């Protein structure tokens, strides 16, 4: 176990005339409706919505931008809060990323690759992230429900519960 502190530059407000080469939107799914109007009004061209919200098509429609300017990504990590800090597990540091229902344009892929150039962060491109996110949720929700039922101790899961996770 290693303790690290990362300082990532973030903003807490986005004015309509602010411009960024890439805008990474990292909010909880329940917060998205509040930030979408701000993002839509902004003049930046390329947006990457990172998270597990299975509504990529609806977000794309709301943003009213060309499909090749909006990406959806899922960070390959997990974690929990413990004593006021975040304990994270990294499963191959990187992100699965792509368009809502079609592959990203070559220009967008190059822009993303350039942003992570010189890092160990691996990008895996997927052509239909709306599908990918829905499949991920269908796979992970049963595991989450059993986790909650066992108070986080999966060794207490019954045979029936374990079977439901992978059925």
Locate predicted features.
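Short, surface-exposed, polar/charged, turn-prone segments marking secondary-structure boundaries
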Residues: 38, 51-54, 75-79, 97-101, ...
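Short, solvent-exposed coil/turn linker segments
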Residues: 10-13, 28, 66, 128, ...
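Rossmann-fold dinucleotide-binding core
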Residues: 55-142
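Active-site-proximal catalytic alpha-helix in oxidoreductases
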Residues: 130-155, 160-167
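A broad detector of the eukaryotic-type serine/threonine protein kinase catalytic domain
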Residues: 44, 121, 147-150
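Soluble or luminal CAZymes and related metallo-dependent hydrolases
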Residues: 31, 104-108, 161, 165
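Rossmann-like NAD(P)(H) cofactor-binding subdomain of soluble oxidoreductases
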Residues: 2-86
């Amino acid at each position: 176990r290693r303790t690290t502190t990362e300082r990532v530059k973030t903003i807490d407000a986005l004015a309509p005339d602010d411009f960024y080469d890439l805008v990474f939107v990292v909010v909880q799914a329940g917060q998205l409706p509040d930030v979408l109007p701000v993002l839509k009004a902004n003049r930046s061209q390329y947006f990457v919505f990172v998270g597990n919200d299975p509504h990529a098509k609806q977000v794309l429609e709301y943003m009213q931008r060309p499909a090749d300017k909006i990406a959806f990504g899922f960070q390959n990590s997990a974690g929990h809060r413990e004593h006021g800090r975040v304990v994270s597990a990294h499963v191959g540091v990187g992100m699965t990323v792509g368009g809502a229902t079609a592959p990203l344009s070559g220009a967008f892929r190059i822009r993303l690759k350039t942003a992570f150039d010189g890092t160990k962060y691996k990008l895996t491109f997927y052509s239909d992230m709306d599908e990918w996110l829905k499949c991920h949720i269908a796979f992970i929700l049963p595991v989450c429900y059993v986790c909650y039922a066992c108070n986080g101790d999966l060794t207490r899961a019954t045979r029936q519960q374990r079977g439901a996770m992978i059925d």
